């Protein structure tokens, strides 16, 4: 990988990339390490599609697309989708799965900052799901997403709140007790408080439209969207 050749792609954590490269071959295993992403994807997709007024015919960018779970599902909704990621192996998995599924997605290995330098104002919808907590400078990602979306377009972020409850739920619970995700997936110090994310949004052309929590019930083994942003949350913003 050549992730340090230009100033635009400095915003890369190679240790984070290595975590996902190591398990990339199992990205589409519904019972594997990415089972939670498969489980929550219908909720994410539904929220994005509803808040954006549908995806059919729209040009969509998925930032930090990984193996393509969300990107493929948005393409199935009729969107023209580009997926960005700095992980070579996850992108190879995404490309192969799209080919096998007969789904057209344009997968590109570059940072969102690099992409923004070439494609500013070209997307109707930009999604950045579970990615901000894996880069050194998440505010830079927020700025780039704002640059990439058209006037009036929608940008969606999802990440984890930083507090004791999120540490218990997302790290201790999900990684060590329930073993829903591999140990070491999350670093609570990199979690982002909603006020911090909204502060970064306020410094761009984006405006907050809606925020919701994503909740897991271990008793029913189910996920749902609803009030409360103590752990996982999703933010809908719109370009002014």
Swiss-Prot record:
Cystine connections: none
Enzyme Commission identifier(s): 2.1.1.222, 2.1.1.64
Family stated for the protein in its record: Belongs to the methyltransferase superfamily. UbiG/COQ3 family.
Protein name, entry field: Ubiquinone biosynthesis O-methyltransferase
Functional description taken from the UniProt entry: O-methyltransferase that catalyzes the 2 O-methylation steps in the ubiquinone biosynthetic pathway.
Organism annotation: Shigella sonnei (strain Ss046)
Pathway: Cofactor biosynthesis; ubiquinone biosynthesis
Residues that coordinate or bind S-adenosyl-L-methionine: 44, 64, 85, 129
Enzyme class: transferase
Superkingdom of the organism of origin: Bacteria
Swiss-Prot/TrEMBL keywords: Methyltransferase, S-adenosyl-L-methionine, Transferase, Ubiquinone biosynthesis
Classification via NCBIfam families: UbiG (TIGR01983)
Lineage, broadest ranks: Bacteria, Pseudomonadati, Pseudomonadota, Gammaproteobacteria, Enterobacterales
Reactions this protein catalyses: a 3-demethylubiquinol + S-adenosyl-L-methionine = a ubiquinol + S-adenosyl-L-homocysteine + H(+); a 3-(all-trans-polyprenyl)benzene-1,2-diol + S-adenosyl-L-methionine = a 2-methoxy-6-(all-trans-polyprenyl)phenol + S-adenosyl-L-homocysteine + H(+)
HAMAP family cross-referenced by the UniProt entry: UbiG
GO molecular function, one term: 2-polyprenyl-6-hydroxyphenol methylase activity
A biological process from GO: methylation
